Amino acid sequence: YADLGGPHGYVVPIFDAAGAQLSENCQLLEDAGLIYVADGPDTLNLVRALRESPALEAMARAFDQAAVILGMGAGAAALGDWIDDPEAQDRAQPGLGWLPSVIVGPRFKGTEAAHRLRRLLDVKPNCLGLGIPEQTALGLGPAGEVENVGPGQVTVVFSGLEVEA
């Protein structure tokens, strides 16, 4: 980012619940103007590390001070109300709840991804599913703004009904 004229960034090392408790990590998050919740192999562990932690509270304070929260892949899924439980196909686990009543399906492509998202909506029928393909983002603004960015189309799934946004 510095090569493009952007400000200096830093990595906040939260890899487990212990990292989410450290005051220095929380201060870095609270002072941030942009928080990037990265992709990774295990959404459930990410959520468990952050849930009800000082780090999550620091992220909320940063957001209240106009920070942008960006979730990528598993990071985007974690921001939803519910996430896929990798250990049980017909079970959902609580997400971080930043997107109330939403289940995010990252890397959304093809019928398998659509079936997985619909299966989660069968378990949590009062939710909205957002299928986000690779190289595509969904921007949500504080005043209700919605923008699809990138070459793919975000798919919105209501229990049984699928609509491209």
Model feature map: region roles:
Residues 1-45, 128, 139-165:
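Extended, subdomain-level signal for the structured scaffold at the beginning of enzyme domains
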Residues 24-27, 61, 94, 122:
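Structural motif
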Residues 34, 83-165:
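C-terminal and late-domain segments of enzyme folds
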Residues 16, 48-54, 78, 123, ...:
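A sequence-level detector of short, solvent-exposed, charge-rich linear segments
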Residues 6, 32, 71-76, 80, ...:
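Small-side-chain structural scaffolding
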Residues 37, 41-115:
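Class I SAM-dependent methyltransferase SAM-binding "motif I" and its flanking Rossmann-like core
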